[in-house]
Amino acid sequence: MKILILGGKGMAGHMITSYFKQKQDYNVFYTSKDINDKDGIYLDVTDSIKLEKIIDSIKPDVTINCIGILNENANNNPKLAFQINSLLPHQLVKLIERTNGKLIHISTDCVFLGTKGNYTENDIPDGTSIYARSKQLGEIVSDKHLTIRTSIIGPELKENGIGLFLWFISQQGTVKGYEKVYWNGVTTLELAKAIDMMIRNKVSGLYHLCSEKKISKNNLLRLIQSIFDKKDVEIVPNSEIFLDRSLTNTRTDFIYKVPPYDEMLIELKEWLDMQ
């Protein structure tokens, strides 16, 4: 089976690429913005003609879209955010369907405002930021394709990455541990494993990939600190901010059992130690 991963050097994309390359039944291709990457296919995703040529040439059975303009970058560049977060997934569907391919699109819990938590697939996205609105518009809900809503933590190749894991690992001294900011996402390794299972089980539509139990960012940081032996940081509990974008999965046709947080983080550490 031919797999094309768009954004193969990003936080989600590089882990998914590494994981799928270790599976013998997948022939893996990935795109990158790094012109010196000899293994990847160079792509500026705003170049629609090049994108079309790549898809027409490879004819992937499954295309995994890991490209996104995130958070502040989206708010500072609204035109680019809507082009990539909103329009690109719909453009991909049209290109991929020419050869009966399938799109797996990665969305985010940030489509929700975070005022109540436990959001289901049937809840109407109410996020108001440029990032939230652009991601809402890009979600593909179709019986042919799959949109995975989730929130991820994991290593990054870019030193200027903005994810929680990289941020925390690079800190020294004291950091705030938010006791009322709740999360129930997955590691990037767990996301890769879940996508593998979803491909094999032909899952489509909208899927919330989440843990059954939510965890505060304070406790999450403490878990990371313990498992990754991060001794040069003191986590100071802080209850000033309330935010709960936790997801709930109501699908019964396919159930992916997300492991406990400590198990996911231990497995991630073991994976990284082997690389």
Residue ranges of predicted features:
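NAD(P)-dependent short-chain dehydrogenase/reductase
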Residues: 128, 140-185, 189-190, 196
